[in-house]
Amino acid sequence: MDLNKVFDAINKNAIKLEFQVNNKEELPIGTSKFGGNPDVPKDFEWFYYVGEDFGGKTKERPLSFLAQINCEEVKQYDEDGLLPSKGMLYFFYELATMRWGFDPQDKGSAKVYYFDGDVTQLIRTNCPDSLEDEFKLDRKGVV
C-alpha cells in the first residue's frame, strides 16, 4: 500500500489564522477576531453548559467566546470550497470544565454557531456578567 497516495486522497486545505499582538485599536463590527466581545445578531442567546469543574463544583456556566470568523474575509483561502462564502462563524467553549467532548455528558460544552445574514446588522454584545473574568479572552484582531 502506497501511503502517499492515501494521504494525497484525504489531504485538505487548511486556513491558518494569525492574530495581532498588542493591538489596542477598536475593530469594526463584523471583523474576524479572537476573544473580546462577539458581534452577534440582535436575537442571539448566549450558550450555557452545566458541568463539573476541577474543584468538583457543578453549575451552569456561560461558554467563553473564542472567535468569530467573517466567511467573506476567508473565502479566498478556502481552496476546497467547504466554508460558506458569507456570514459569520462563531466558536464558544466552556473553559472552567474544559471538556474534551468524548463523554456524552460533554454535549453543549462547545458550540459552533453560524449566522448567514448581513454582517453589517450585527451588534457588539458583552459577555454575560456570570462569566468569570479569567474566562474572558482578550481581543486580538486577525491578520
Label each PLM-derived region with a short phrase.
Residues 142-143:
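Conserved small/polar residues in nucleotide/adenosyl-binding loops
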Residues 63-127:
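Aromatic- and glycine-enriched beta-alpha-beta binding-site module
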Residues 1-88:
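An N-terminus-focused feature that recognizes amino-terminal "leader" regions
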